[in-house]
Regions:
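Sec-dependent signal peptide recognition
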Residues: 2-10
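C-terminal outer-membrane/trafficking sorting elements
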Residues: 5, 15-18, 645-729
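A general, composition-driven signal for non-globular sequence regions
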Residues: 9, 403, 535, 719-720
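Residue-level signal for alpha-helical transmembrane segments in multi-pass membrane proteins
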Residues: 12-16, 62
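Acidic/polar surface patches and capping/hinge elements
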Residues: 22-641
Length: 729
């Protein structure tokens, strides 16, 4: 697969001759961080944070000289970290000062964040090259801006962001290592095709590789990758709200925003296993895998005339609605398409393409394959493409004055960066708590068990795969899969993409689709990557993409790509990386940002990475995050934000003693009406006490409280979170 960036470069070179000779300084540095992400370890959570923090730094460097805007970090308390700022003179040329502050801040911050990258030499050299191309001096390292040095202010801003990042609960100081999480399942050794029937079928299973190549192409020998960022829900967010936070415990405290509830757990089927939502979800993944056969000449219209335009109010909530929303047999989901291009007033032209080519291309296009800038970076790249388009009018939100390139980029990056970071915090908190299984483990598990449809057969098992003629069947005597001495007779076979065992040279070979043993099922991926190393529920792609699409819709003031269509050319036999293909060239097309987002979600099912249960709730949460991030960013842009109105601006508070006996003391700088709420670790409210008149010292009597661990929250009259502490009695 070519990365999205490569496609956009081709598009820009061939269709977008309008590019300015010189980008804004914010765009220059954004391009640098995207390239550094491609050269780093594949860590969507870490890089969403890097993109947000860098966007926040650049925004603050601009905002200090703007008459209306309010800084996010500089001179504020963000999370529980206070970044002091004593002010600086306003120069006669603010653009030059902003350029200098941004460059020094970004150079120092990115050098720190990527110093341990596997390709640190390349990235750090790139940072230095850009920095020195502006005429700046790497030897200026002072952070004392009291003499009105803009270079020093940039260094100071970077150092403060570095310090903040060392206490924002990301565990950056220990290379983001997990502190509490342990997997409940032993690793699946992929190539041995061993029995996988002894795992917990509702929990994530690590994968063991002879050679593992991560999403950015880094090679590891004899590797079993750990769960990436299962504790990320506790990282300081941008716009996530305290009232949407629940602290749950599954062997460690999980900070879960917008709790989606439990996924589908496997049922003990007594007959007709396909009626079990769990089995239906993973059987659908098998069914869609059968679409990846280039010898299948089934044609579908992939133009906006037929695809897209799926309203959020049509998203399923019940099992029956899921069965109607996703087309089990033919693939895809509901969506009426668009009758007309609203920009041109002309109908979209039909584009008939082989389903097998489209589904394979889509799976690779959005996959986190090698050389990926990860999903948050993908959407920054799309944002930059939109910004460069000749039909884009840079009115923020589609209203008001046309902005300079710098102001446009600065504001876009903060809004999108906040949405991407909050998506990572939200979804990885959910992933860490629910710890849900991936298709490769679930399908191999059920196939190891047997079948769950016919109770009269000796291979019936309540946890087996449901039998579906032409898709999931039993190996009979004489079957090509029967094996030596009929050793496989009675086992389960599935009709799916055959997997990497049938590919010697990806440039010339095609695995195709055929019957394979269910215990040897593979997602459509490279054998050195297979599936991202973290739980499936909920889908990061679905959430990142929906949040980004919502952000872009609000940023531009339009649902539609510039000109009413976004197009990406796919060359015959010069796109796929997992195997040869596609067999014909065609053009990927999307009318709206949300159409692209929805196709991203479906691509993960065709690729065998997610079942439907991982998808929809991620889209819904992503929509919410995109709106909330944009709304909060707008408040900063217009200077209408109150420091106590959002969850990330918390009040300095001491809670002691810990552990407490019968009395807990709370000392706070917040002197207005306050409500103290005590919660169990399961999120149950134990008691709530409203205090109107106090001098900043509050006492709580705990005589009747059972021994244990609790969460104490302080909430303002406007229901904003002031502080949150874990306490022990």
């Amino acid at each position: 697969m070519k990365s999205l960036l490569s496609l956009l470069i081709v598009l820009i070179l061939t269709q977008v001759s309008f590019l300015n000779a010189q980008n804004s300084v914010a765009r220059d540095w954004n391009d640098e961080i995207l390239e550094a992400i491609r050269n780093d370890y594949a860590r969507p959570t870490v890089h969403a944070r890097n993109l947000f923090h860098s966007s926040m730094v650049m925004y603050d460097a601009w905002a200090i000289f703007d008459e209306s805007a309010e800084t996010v970090f500089l001179g504020k308390t963000f999370g529980e970290y206070t970044c002091n700022f004593n002010g600086i003179i306003t120069p006669s040329n603010t653009n030059e000062a902003i350029h200098e502050i941004i460059s020094y801040a970004m150079y120092r911050l990115l050098t720190h964040r990527f110093k341990n990258s596997p390709n640190a030499t390349i990235s750090l050299d790139n940072f230095t090259t850009l920095f020195e191309s502006y005429g700046y001096d790497t030897m200026i390292t002072s952070t004392d801006y009291s003499l009105n040095s803009f270079a020093a202010l940039g260094n100071y801003l970077a150092q403060e962001m570095i310090n903040f990042g060392l206490q924002d609960n990301s565990n950056e100081q220990n290379n983001y290592e997990n502190q509490y999480y342990t997997s409940q399942n032993e690793a699946l050794i992929l190539d041995l095709y061993e029995d996988n029937s002894l795992i917990n079928p509702n929990k994530w299973q690590p994968l063991a590789f002879d050679v593992f190549i991560d999403q950015s192409g880094n090679i590891y020998a004899l590797e079993t990758p750990e769960f990436l960022s299962p504790e990320w829900g506790q990282v300081t967010p941008f716009s996530l709200k305290s009232e949407d936070l629940t602290i749950l415990n599954n062997s460690f405290d999980s900070y879960v925003y917008n709790d989606p509830g439990f996924p589908e757990f496997i049922q003990n089927s007594t007959s007709d296993g396909i009626t079990d939502p769990y089995k239906w979800n993973f059987a659908l993944v098998i069914a869609w895998s059968a679409h990846l056969d280039p010898t299948d000449d089934t044609l579908i219209d992939i133009s906006p005339a037929s695809l897209g335009n799926t309203a959020i109010n049509t998203f399923p909530t019940t099992f029956e609605e899921y069965q109607s929303f996703y087309n089990f047999t033919e693939g895809g989901s509901t969506g009426s398409g668009h009758e007309l291009n609203p920009i041109t007033g002309v109908a979209y032209t039909s584009q008939m393409v082989k389903r097998s080519d489209y589904t394979r291309v889509l799976a690779e296009f959005w996959a986190d394959g090698p050389d990926s800038e990860t999903p948050p970076g993908h959407w920054f790249t799309i944002l930059n493409y939109v910004s460069d388009h000749p039909e884009t009018v840079k009115k923020f939100g589609g209203q008001g004055a046309i902005l300079s390139d710098l102001e446009w980029d600065i504001k876009c990056y903060l809004a999108l960066g906040g949405a991407m970071h909050d998506s990572a915090v939200n979804i990885w908190g959910i992933k860490g708590y629910y710890d849900y299984i991936r298709p490769i483990s679930a399908i191999r598990y059920m196939a190891s068990k047997g079948q769950s449809t016919n109770t009269s057969l000796n291979n019936f098992d309540p946890h087996g795969l449901p039998l579906i003629p032409g898709l999931i069947e039993i190996v009979e005597i004489g079957d090509p899969l029967a094996g030596d001495d009929d050793s496989n007779v009675g086992t389960i076979k599935v009709k799916s993409w055959k997997g990497p065992d049938f590919i010697s040279n990806p440039a010339t070979d095609v695995a195709g689709v055929d019957w394979i043993l269910g215990t040897q099922w593979w997602p459509y991926q490279r054998p050195t990557f297979v599936t991202p190393p973290f739980a499936g529920y909920l889908s990061g792609h679905s959430t990142f993409s929906r949040a980004a699409a919502t952000s872009l819709t609000q940023i531009t003031g339009s649902e539609f790509f510039p000109g009413g269509i976004g197009t990406f050319e796919v060359e015959q036999n010069n796109f796929l990386v997992f195997e040869q293909g596609p067999s014909e060239g065609f053009t990927l097309e999307w009318a709206t940002y949300q159409d692209a987002s929805d196709q991203t979600s479906l691509s993960r099912i065709w690729g065998g990475i997610h079942p439907p249960i991982d998808d929809i709730k991620g889209r819904i949460i992503g929509e919410k995050i995109g709106k909330e991030s944009f709304d909060l960013a707008q408040q900063y842009f217009t200077g209408t934000l109150s420091n106590t109105s959002i969850s990330t601006h918390k009040i300095s508070t001491e809670v002691y003693p810990i552990p407490a006996l019968n009395t807990l003391h709370v000392k706070t700088q917040y002197l207005e009406e306050i409500t103290l709420q005590l919660y169990s670790l399961t999120g149950k409210l134990i008691f709530s006490k409203n205090i109107k008149n106090h001098q900043g010292i509050l006492d709580l009597k705990l005589d009747d409280l059972a021994q244990g661990v609790y969460i104490l929250k302080g909430v303002s009259k406007s229901n904003s979170l002031l502080f949150q502490r874990k306490i022990i009695k």
